[in-house]
Design a protein with these regions (language model features):
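Catalytic cores of nucleophile-dependent amide-cleaving enzymes
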Residues: 91-135
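Proline-aspartate-enriched helix->loop->beta-strand connector
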Residues: 54-68, 125
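Short helix-loop-beta junction
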Residues: 26-37
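Short, acidic/turn-prone active-site loops that include or flank metal/cofactor-
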Residues: 41-44, 131-139
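Acidic, metal-coordinating helix/loop segments flanking the phosphotransfer/catalytic sites
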Residues: 44-58
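Short acidic, S/G/P-rich loop/turn micro-motifs used as interaction or catalytic elements
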Residues: 18-21, 44-45, 68-72
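A short, glycine/acidic-enriched catalytic loop
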Residues: 71-89
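Extended, charged alpha/beta regions that create polyanion-binding interfaces
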Residues: 1-13, 17-28
Length: 139
């Protein structure tokens, strides 16, 4: 018995601050047959270009990533300025929500290995990375 199903995965727009990971992502999206556009954009520039890219590609899913970590002098996990790029990711999420106001319009994944999870979720990401969850995996 053969059952044929049409599966719609949605169009992906992926912004990544690291060229190596951008290139890897393109490779994996192609292998999986996903409809994805990957742009290598430094974290600090992502918020300023996200609306233009959303208008151009009209994705269902937005992935915002790059590198992030606590700064060496940072001791307060609840201060966004103690993270290298979390504020840039949060700003990009806020800008993107001007275009896709709800998760039905645009699903947003944001952050990197050690991002400020709570700030990304408050910015209205649907999914985010967490430093405490990710650090535990490598200790």
């Amino acid at each position: 018995m053969s059952i044929e199903k049409n599966i719609y995965t949605g169009k992906i727009l992926h912004l990544d601050g690291d060229r190596r990971y951008s290139d890897k992502s393109v490779k994996y999206y192609r292998q999986l047959g996903l409809d994805a556009v990957v742009k290598n954009i430094p974290e600090y520039r992502q918020a300023s270009v996200v609306i233009e890219l959303l208008e151009r590609y009209k994705p269902d899913i937005l992935i915002i990533t790059g590198h992030d970590s606590m700064i060496k002098k940072g001791t307060d996990y609840n201060n966004i300025y103690n993270y290298r790029n979390s504020r840039h990711f949060a700003n990009t999420v806020r800008e993107a929500r001007k275009w896709g106001k709800t998760s039905r319009e645009l699903v947003i994944f944001a952050g990197a290995c050690q991002s400020f999870f709570e700030a990304l979720m408050l910015a209205r990401a649907d999914f985010a990375s967490s430093p405490r969850k990710n650090i535990d995996r490598f200790c």
